[in-house]
Amino acid sequence: MRHRCRVHKLGKPADQRKALLRSLSTQLIRHGRVTTTKARAKAVRSQVEKMITLAKDGSLASRRQALGYIYDKQLVHALFDQVADRYGDRNGGYTRIIRTIRRRGDNAEMAIIELT
C-alpha cells in the first residue's frame, strides 16, 4: 500500500518531472544556488540530499548510482572529491530554501535553493 507516500507531481507527466528534477539537481550542484518556484525547490531538495549522502558514502556503487542520475560526469567526480570535507560532520540538512518575491508573469511563489 502506498499510504502517505507522496510525490511532488509539479503538474507534469512522470518522465518530464524526472528530467526536470535531474536538471535542477545538476544545476544546483554545479552552481550552488538556483532560483525556481517554491514547489520545485521543495521537490529538488530531497534529490540533492540523496546525491550528497551518496557522495559521502564514496563507494563505487554510490558513484555509479550518482552517475546515472546527474547529467555531468565531471560534476559527479568533483562532488565526490569535495563533499567529505564540506559535509563530513553533518547528517542531512545540506540545502536551504529562501523565499523571494513572487514571479511577475503569473504571481507564482519563487524561492532560492542553495547548498549550505
Swiss-Prot record:
Task: Name the HAMAP family for this protein.
Answer: Ribosomal_bL17 (MF_01368)
Instruction: Cite the record's note on assembly.
Output: Part of the 50S ribosomal subunit. Contacts protein L32.
InterPro entries the UniProt entry points to: Ribosomal_bL17, Ribosomal_bL17_sf
The reply to whether Zinc figures as a keyword in the UniProt entry is no
- The scientific name of the source species is Acaryochloris marina (strain MBIC 11017)
Give the family per the record.
Answer: Belongs to the bacterial ribosomal protein bL17 family.
The GO biological-process annotations, alphabetized, read as: translation
Under Gene Ontology molecular function, one entry of this record is: structural constituent of ribosome
| A Gene Ontology cellular-component term | cytosolic large ribosomal subunit
The record's listing under PANTHER family reads: LARGE RIBOSOMAL SUBUNIT PROTEIN BL17M (PTHR14413:SF16), RIBOSOMAL PROTEIN L17 (PTHR14413)
Q: What is this protein called?
A: Large ribosomal subunit protein bL17
The record's keywords, sorted A to Z, are: Ribonucleoprotein, Ribosomal protein
Quote the Pfam families the UniProt record gives.
Ribosomal_L17 (PF01196)
